[in-house]
Amino acid sequence: MPRFFTRHAATLFFPMALILYDFAAYLSTDLIQPGIINVVRDFNADVSLAPAAVSLYLAGGMALQWLLGPLSDRIGRRPVLITGALIFTLACAATMFTTSMTQFLIARAIQGTSICFIATVGYVTVQEAFGQTKGIKLMAIITSIVLIAPIIGPLSGAALMHFMHWKVLFAIIAVMGFISFVGLLLAMPETVKRGAVPFSAKSVLRDFRNVFCNRLFLFGAATISLSYIPMMSWVAVSPVILIDAGSLTTSQFAWTQVPVFGAVIVANAIVARFVKDPTEPRFIWRAVPIQLVGLSLLIVGNLLSPHVWLWSVLGTSLYAFGIGLIFPTLFRFTLFSNKLPKGTVSASLNMVILMVMSVSVEIGRWLWFNGGRLPFHLLAVVAGVIVVFTLAGLLNRVRQHQAAELVEEQ
């Protein structure tokens, strides 16, 4: 058994531990959301504080991006990610002992830092530890599994709260976090030479400057962040569109989200199982028409035959399937088609994505309340069309980078 563990630690148990950590981080929001009103009432707090449980979690996710990437480039990936798993576990455990809404929200913000650790350090380690094609396929598998959480989380949370207190849910998540912590401690490989670059403010700023001056990174960051807009604006504003304006029940609304997340899961499963080379430009370009057809349905369907949810869900799901086919490849290209420190590149990319997502959600909300369904969906269409051009720029830069590497090898 020890020999089997040693042989498969990096290839099997490390990805499993990372998946569990990522899954637990998602569940810390998705599992508790159906009962967030109960949380507020338990603390005798104002109901208006309920959304803060999510917003502060996301704020925690943005707080340490600038630090963790450069830090992991210098002291190694292992100590940073393992520390993150421990912090998340302790924050979930601490939630069981909160006695006020303020304490609960502080714990939520600390739990949110898991986004920083996973996205900035964990995903980079996966890409570094495995080859290009295997790394992309493994990330597709991780995404497919983790995205089950937004589907089953709310339904499971609502069911479990009929039998147990909401604090017990955080105890369950804390146990999951602790198991992932132990798994990472035992199985995570180190992919960075420690101490190769000294940690100083000057060197960190220089690395960030070099990243944001790299045109390939800029094309990649623009492509990925704009690709998120159609899905994230829908996820954020759809409760208002479907429940408030469309008069759907919360249960009906939950089921309308399944096709969107399910489409991404299916797309990633196809990449992992059936696509021989997901970096092939012809495969990437074949996914683009699927995205554009989905975006077209958002406008054409609602113009010709308006429906409370059909065209919005169908169009967004089709788009999600198309972009899901190439998301892992886009991340790989953006992170590794340069000679820049990967932790800093990952941190920079995540900061751009989170900023664009935040702005796009606010724009989408404003368009819905001031213009209605069609102007709201037009935001997704505009973003999707721009992506075609930024994707062309990204692939052109990647091709130039690969050609330059071949010349250097010769």
Curated annotation (Swiss-Prot):
Keywords: Antibiotic resistance, Antiport, Cell inner membrane, Cell membrane, Ion transport, Membrane, Potassium, Potassium transport, Sodium, Sodium transport, Transmembrane, Transmembrane helix, Transport. Signal peptide: none annotated. InterPro entries: MFS, MFS_dom, MFS_trans_sf, Sugar_transporter_CS. Coiled coil: none annotated. Efflux is inhibited by the ionophore carbonyl cyanide 3-chlorophenylhydrazone (CCCP). Residues 33-48, 100-103, 162-167, 238-251, 304-307, 370-373 are periplasmic. It catalyses: Na(+)(in) + 2 H(+)(out) = Na(+)(out) + 2 H(+)(in); K(+)(in) + H(+)(out) = K(+)(out) + H(+)(in). Optimum pH is 9.0 for K(+)/H(+) exchange activity. Optimum pH is 9.25 for Na(+)/H(+) exchange activity. The chain crosses the membrane at residues 12-32, 49-69, 79-99, 104-124, 141-161, 168-188, 217-237, 252-272, 283-303, 308-328, 349-369, 374-394. Residues 1-11, 70-78, 125-140, 189-216, 273-282, 329-348, 395-410 are cytoplasmic. It is found in: Cell inner membrane. One of its GO terms (cellular component) is plasma membrane. GO terms for molecular function: bile acid transmembrane transporter activity; potassium:proton antiporter activity; sodium:proton antiporter activity. GO terms for biological process: bile acid and bile salt transport; potassium ion export across plasma membrane; regulation of cellular pH; response to antibiotic; sodium ion export across plasma membrane; xenobiotic detoxification by transmembrane export across the plasma membrane. CDD domains: MFS_MdfA_MDR_like. Gene3D superfamilies: Multidrug resistance protein D. It is a multi-pass membrane protein. Monomer. Proton-dependent efflux pump. Confers resistance to a broad spectrum of chemically unrelated substrates. Overexpression confers resistance to acriflavine, chloramphenicol, norfloxacin, ethidium bromide and tetraphenylphosphonium bromide (TPP). Can also export a broad range of quaternary ammonium compounds (QACs) and contribute to the intrinsic resistance of E.coli to these antimicrobial compounds. In addition to its role in multidrug resistance, MdtM likely plays a physiological role in alkaline pH homeostasis and in resistance to bile salts. Belongs to the major facilitator superfamily. Overexpression of MdtM can compensate for loss of MdfA. This is Multidrug resistance protein MdtM. It comes from Escherichia coli (strain K12). The gene is mdtM.
